[in-house]
Amino acid sequence: MKTGKKIAVLALIFVAAAIIYFVWPLGRKEENKTGVVYTAMGEAELPVVYPTALGRELAPLFGHREELAVTAERDSLLVLPEDRRLPIRIQYGDEIKTLQYEIRTMDMTHLVERTTVTDWTEENGQINAVLPVQNLLEPETQYQLGIQAVLSDGTSAWYYARILETDNDHAAQMLALAEDFSQKTFHYDSAQELTTYMESTPSADNSSFGTVTLKNSFTQMTWGSLGVSRGETVFASLKELSGDLANIELEYYVTREADGGAGGTDGGETEVYGVTENFTLKWSSQRIYMMDYERTMNQLFSGSRELFSGKRILLGISDGDGLYAKKSESGRYTA
């Protein structure tokens, strides 16, 4: 087989793997202001549910074909609004015929509520609904929420999250701080305010943007000379909330125009990176403390010829984790 054909095969394999790894967690189809469209695979072929809590629309919930019988995923924690009415938006919802939800204790042994949703509207394939959670929950106690969407073919899609009823708005304040911190890293002047949280040390590794923490330099935190631009869509999720301590995650894409430097890419080619920021925050009446922070960055492999050097593949910026191999259908090539 000619070298050109080998490169084409390897490129196709890596593009497929990269799409699954980077784009699946960020939704089936998202478009940012750069005009680049990303499409995910697999479970996201089902309708996608976007809950609203803490004053904003949060990261999407992806559907499962089967009801989870034992425990729910711990990816998302939703703090209920004061009236316990939880708004959701369902993308690609034109396949949905009926919608209901159930609430169980976290050990799944006790059914607290099961309700058919009637308060919903549909327009252009998108559903806006409200889950009218009843006054049956113990405050400051997490429960398992399962949303069942019955589709036009008679099958069901299940969506899971944890829910919590609380009297304080500390989580919303901490989410606002995380979003503000993230936004300011893209603006050098306003980012000066972030030095309050930083703990820069000479021993920190400032040689790569793959992983950045509070111990890195200010230049590293503010993207150095990369010249990246963030897309308009930022997915936020509350991972944990225990008293005044919260763990929050932001996911988004950044793009940059390649300059033809390291990596051999031609000028003008748009490079795309998946970015995840994780914050551990502690609320107090005086201020919010940042207990831990980590930003990881992975380049989305495009498969262009410039990213191949002989038998090597130039993967660009990466956090050093999550590199997988995949074989071609014939089993002859591994990438």
Predicted feature residues:
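Short, solvent-exposed aromatic-acidic interface loops
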Residues: 164, 291-302
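Core segments of small alpha/beta cavity-forming domains
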Residues: 40-101, 109-111, 142-150, 154-225, ...
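Surface-exposed, charged secondary-structure patches
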Residues: 27-31, 71-87, 96-124, 129-147, ...
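N-terminal Sec-pathway targeting helices
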Residues: 1-15, 23
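Short, solvent-exposed coil/turn segments at beta-strand boundaries
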Residues: 83-84, 106-108, 241-245, 281-288, ...
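Beta-strand elements of well-folded, non-transmembrane domains
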Residues: 92, 151, 252-256, 285
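Ser/Thr/Pro/Gly-rich low-complexity linker/stalk segments immediately outside membranes or between
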Residues: 26-45
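Hydrophobic/aromatic beta-strand elements that line small-molecule binding cavities or substrate pockets
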Residues: 234-239, 276-282
